[in-house]
Amino acid sequence: MVGPFKKILHAHNQRFPPSSSSSLDPVVDDSSRKQTRIILSYLLHLSLSLHITYSLCLLHFFFGSSNPFSPMEESNNSAVVDFPDNFMDQLLWEECWEEEATQHDQALSSPSGLKERVACAMGHLQEVMGERELLIQLWVPVETRSGRVLSTEEQPYSINTFSQSQSLALYRDASAGYSFAAEVGSEQLVGLPGRVFLRRMPEWTPDVRFFRKEEYPRIGYARRYQVRATLALPLFQGTSGNCVAVMEMVTTHRNLEYASQLSTICHALEAFDLRTSQTSIVPASLKVTSSSSSSSRTEVASILQGICSSHGLPLAVTWGHQDSSSCLSALISASYAADHGSRCFLAACSEHHLLGGEGIAGRAFATKKQCFATDVAIFSKWSYPLSHYAKMFDLHAALAVPILTRGNRTVQFVLELFFPRDCLDIQTHSLTLASQLKLRFQSSPHLMVDDNQIAEEVRDAATPPLTQEDPKGKQVSFSFSSASSLENRKRKTKAEKDITLDTLRQHFAGSLKDAAKNIGVCPTTLKRICRQNGISRWPSRKIKKVGHSLRKLQVVMDSVEGVQGSLHLASFYSSFPQLQSSSSSSFPFINPTQTVHVPPKSPPSSSGSQSSSGSSTCCSSEEQQLGGFQKPALSHPQLLTLSSMHEDQRPVRVTSSLPPLPSATTPRKAKDGMKVKAMFGDSMLRMSLLPHSRLTDLRREIAKRFGMDDVLRSNFSLKYLDDDQEWVLLTCDADLEECIQVYKSSSLKETIRILVHHPLSRPSFGS
């Protein structure tokens, strides 16, 4: 009996190999219990085999055979019974173990079976990855009262550490307290595991600190426990395509090689009947077809080489696509990188797909229009999957130009050009580059650039709406439908286009705040609409500025001996009833060429025409236009009288030693720039804003003064106090220009007051 039993045990071990040792307590307990059940089953089947042997012995006794297992001799009333040599093996295997085998097959697809395979896979991955500090944990959907959520509590995990630090263990404990949405429409947080589970696509980042809090709710714990790179993979059951769990891998250092390691990870998982996304994770090289021929790539590469060299561009990425796909992949052979950082970013581009609408390249591909962004590094990872790499390698402003085929005018390539880091005027530079590309592609027999386009600015889209609940109870809206967010942006753009110049003129008499309220938009949107129509300053503010300048001018004139009462400039503003009317079709402005001279102190003597000491001033303003509408010259009786005087009666221009008055169009301190007072929490500092400074320069200086690290720099926001005593958000260079102009042209102090806000800091409201 020992021989058959050994054969049975050996066959069972070959068919169902025991789980390898693991440090996972839940898995070890389940495995121990199952092994106990198997041993008891062995004993039961052994007793059954003994019972069968005893029965055969009884048969032998009655039939009189010397060997119960040998063929029986023929008799008149008996039949020959032949027991083969492997009779006992067949008996025990086919009948005794059939039910156990069926139960084990069912266990492979059960949660406990998944845990065992994942536990074995985790141990194997720790050896394959070779990371000195690595946490692998499993997120499994569970049913709760609030719905189906992803949880890692009481699920397998593995920690590999060679240091005394307990940071990964503490981060594991913190993660166990979180649950994420496992179905669309859930009120739970989405987070990284939720996005991977719902999208069924892997996601990774070189540094989790680049995430926003709404994208990665555990960002606070990640910073505290020095967590850096992370990779999350969806796990599928066999070939069914159903996502059954999410495996998350976390390290304490930055990792730029996850994409290259994905192939190894996938093979390691397949050894345990675990599979990840069926979609290609790393973009495969595009097939050379009619839509993406090698000759076209060579032509594009040559043009990019010339453009980047002549304009000093650090990077230019060529994106291509398959004929039947809207997914963009980087074409390395047709791209250009000038330095090491650009080459690293280009390598990251080769490891990512861009779907329609993602980044400015995806937006240009979807709309067939040129797009530019002042800073792609501040985009969310949902809006631009490469935003974290842009932060790492200091890439900001970029322009995307779709390259069309001459025949059917379909998009064949998208060129993404990154501007130099010291480029100030992004929009002008975009127009120049687009014009140069158009000229260079004119000689191409197959490719072209649309010559009837003006690049539109793309800002970071809000994270797509899918209702979530913040840990503090605040509702946050998210969605995994990029089409809905794109539709909202289109609707908003259409509403802005409906506001014409005539509509704006009807509200010129009031303040900007009242006009925005009456039109039905926010003040920031109204300012943007005004800039699109050529209005750099809301007229009522400009009139107040001119009136204030005239009053200051009157004070200077009155201080000059002999000119008191000769000309009252302070009454100009009150003398224009048209300024208070909103029904006027044209709005009066001061003519930029109109000049007011101060009359001499006394009539010229008979001995000659001698100029006396006086003051000569000129009231002029920068020429303004409203969308091509030229503002009419000022028609006022006093000015007409001055212009119609006889040449001998006209005021004489005199010189003065008084310092010139500050002009509204020049900075008060051209050398030192504007003074800035920045407040961050309970801290405050003063600094100078140099002329022509960009918002990125201001953010960088503020972050440096307050001692912020790279992650904090990318997450804080700035607001300035405007002339309506409201905090207005600074999001781009145009907002910064608006801020400077408000302080220059209003009665505010010369020091710009800026509020620095960070999601993890307590709000500060300066007085």
Swiss-Prot record:
Chain residue ranges for the region called Disordered: 462-494, 590-622, 646-672
Broad class of the protein's primary localization: nucleus
Pfam families given in the database record: GAF_NLP (PF22922), PB1 (PF00564), RWP-RK (PF02042)
Species the sequence originates in: Arabidopsis thaliana
Cross-referenced InterPro entries: NLP, NLP1-9_GAF, PB1-like, PB1_dom, PB1_NLP, RWP-RK_dom
GO BP annotations, alphabetical order: regulation of DNA-templated transcription
Localization: Nucleus
PANTHER family: PROTEIN NLP3, PROTEIN NLP8
Keywords: Coiled coil, DNA-binding, Nucleus, Transcription, Transcription regulation
Domain PB1: 673-759
Coiled coil: 485-506
MF-aspect GO terms: DNA binding; DNA-binding transcription factor activity
Stretches assigned to the RWP-RK domain: 482-566
Cited Gene3D superfamilies: Phosphatidylinositol 3-kinase Catalytic Subunit, Chain A, domain 1
Compositional bias per record (Low complexity), positions renumbered to this chain: 604-622, 655-667
PROSITE patterns recorded: PB1, RWP_RK
Positions of disulphide bridges: none
Protein name per Swiss-Prot or TrEMBL: Protein NLP3
GO cellular component: nucleus
